[in-house]
């Protein structure tokens, strides 16, 4: 596989509500949808739909949710590299309001270990790109970084959620893809200072996502603003995952970082015009056409 993604996977449920909870308020959902998910899992589907050859590695329990995760990957043409472990598969509840905004609660479930990553060495060694997020435990993350370095594999780190333990690994990534708040946490600045700090950021390549405003592509001190396509959002859940998967797919297709970033921003713009996550990921023909 050209792209290996290691991340969290589990079952996701999507209740749709008119507005988010006020204190002590009980809400009644007017719609309910369920599908497998997780940041890395979503990124894998996005990359595969953009034409990449993808393998996804995650941990699941010996339960129906774990089986559903593997089955959907196969349906999307993705190679599932699942570690089946004692315990429950991860679970997420994504509440979406009528504006398309969301609130997410995650139960992490069973977790990958460093030993699980060791079992993936052959797949990592043969990959051209490795995509990681710190939603997996640090020992597994560290071992994946070590194996990528050993075999000369480029690593893209999507530092979401941003946690302090990820900081020592950022310098070894080929590219970082934080959102605005994660970039501010990385650089120790306020949002209004972000662009000035990015101009002298220590990392040579960053793609900072700005939600509906698009993204900032930073290379060797040069910064380019990439506007998002103007759309009416239906559901913003998974837009960042879409962008990361599409970015990696286009890098593997031979695009420069800036070229890949422009197409990734377009893919993310298209994704928010549709409900839910996996079904919202655009196909390569939609983005390239």
Where are the language model's segments positioned?
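Glycine-rich phosphate/adenosyl-contacting loop at the front of the ribokinase-like
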Residues: 1-59, 64-68, 233
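Ribokinase/PfkB-type carbohydrate-kinase core domain
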Residues: 1-9, 71-84, 96-223, 283
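Conserved phosphate-binding/catalytic region of the ribokinase-like
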Residues: 3-4, 164, 168, 191-289
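Short glycine/proline- and charge-enriched loop/turn segments
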Residues: 21-29, 177-179, 224-227
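Small-residue (primarily alanine) positions within well-ordered alpha-helices
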Residues: 44, 148, 183, 260, ...
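Gly/Ala-rich phosphate-binding loop of Rossmann-like dinucleotide-binding domains
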Residues: 48-49, 149, 252
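Hydrophobic residues at beta-strand termini and immediately following loops
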Residues: 57, 105, 226-227
